[in-house]
């Protein structure tokens, strides 16, 4: 704080730039992180990057039944949804603390 209770703008700018850099690094790490989703007790597993890209699908041969394709389709959709949920949780865990740091820049009302 400067005299008169005003925030030191150069210090605020430096802090904001530091938080921005940390956020960019965390976003890059998140985009490259991989999570696993599953359905059917692990019969179908999906690996997804934090960017949302599906990089692997593993299907247990026990669930492959040509006369019941719908079940396999449902399991794949469920595994992708589970992986997407895991990405959301990971993003919250990794980016949440940085977003919370934005409020501590010393500006009134933040």
From Swiss-Prot:
GO cellular component: bacterial nucleoid; cytosol
GO molecular function, one term: DNA binding
Chief localisation class: cytoplasm
Compartmental location: Cytoplasm, Nucleoid
Gene3D superfamilies to which the protein is assigned, alphabetical: Nucleoid-associated protein YbaB-like domain
Signal peptide span: none
Cited Pfam families: YbaB_DNA_bd (PF02575)
Presence of the UniProt keyword Cytoplasm in the record: yes
Keyword DNA-binding: yes
Keywords in alphabetical order: Cytoplasm, DNA-binding
Annotated function: Binds to DNA and alters its conformation. May be involved in regulation of gene expression, nucleoid organization and DNA protection.
Family: Belongs to the YbaB/EbfC family.
Assembly mode: Homodimer.
Protein name (Swiss-Prot/TrEMBL): Nucleoid-associated protein Mvan_5528
Organism per entry: Mycolicibacterium vanbaalenii (strain DSM 7251 / JCM 13017 / BCRC 16820 / KCTC 9966 / NRRL B-24157 / PYR-1)
